[in-house]
């Protein structure tokens, strides 16, 4: 089947919005921040000849819904379990960036619907908040002043760890891209939720499923380090798969490479 945007009715009036395409073993994708399910469309296109790919649109990034600055990801976990029940067969859950944290939280709550998990550079908290003690506060202050470009620059440099030169391009991006502009406040909510969760390594150590961790050789160092630390506590972790020429956005820049790694992992069951 071709990709169709669907809505699953649930007890929550918001329901669950997702795309569903292909047939075969199920891959359930949880996108990262500042995006929606379309960020993984290229990877899905590589996978659908052999797999059914279901891509949720995280409620945090559904701009028709009210913002939820106090989110703790619990509702997003609810959505994923509702969608897994609707799918009705075991799946491999794939999460990217903050979406990887949501995927981990989903498996921690109840691993039964899943046979495995793929996480691509989850920005887990290890000690101090991601982005430092004042990163989110400073980004929110920029938003309050009507400067979403500055907020995104703070996020990109302090939280993601990109060079300052990249950060200074963010105000330009926000001016010319209305979609990105609309998602900047949601991204800051997302980051604050991650920091609010704190260090969850003990909880993630309870995940017995096979887990494939992905990282890029050109990714900011702290994201690679967080990935390595997570791999050490997961009892079912496979060797970390490093994409030497990629960074944090290989789903867009190298979809065939990401699809190969995900596909090989799914076929291993």
PLM region spans:
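Catalytic histidine-centered segment of alpha/beta-hydrolase-like enzymes
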Residues: 243-256
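Active-site loop/oxyanion-hole signature of alpha/beta-hydrolase fold enzymes
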Residues: 42-45, 54-94, 98, 257-260
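Conserved HGGG/HGGXW glycine-rich cap/lid loop of the alpha/beta-hydrolase fold
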Residues: 10-66
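Conserved hydrolase catalytic core segment
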Residues: 90-128
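Glycine-rich phosphate-binding loop signature in dinucleotide/nucleotide-binding domains
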Residues: 22, 86-89, 265, 269
